[in-house]
Amino acid sequence: MQEQILASCVNLLATLNQKCLFPCNNKGFFIEFNSLWTFFFV
């Protein structure tokens, strides 16, 4: 169950950041992605 929730959050995060990926040179996405993993696993 937790994996499905995590996958949904990652998909949502990717969708929200899709417009920003190239202009931000991926930095914004990876910072938020790392924060998401920290939230789930720390």
From Swiss-Prot:
UniProt keyword list: Leader peptide
Listed name of the protein: Aspartate-semialdehyde dehydrogenase leader peptide
Origin species: Streptococcus mutans serotype c (strain ATCC 700610 / UA159)
Source species taxonomy: Bacteria, Bacillati, Bacillota, Bacilli, Lactobacillales
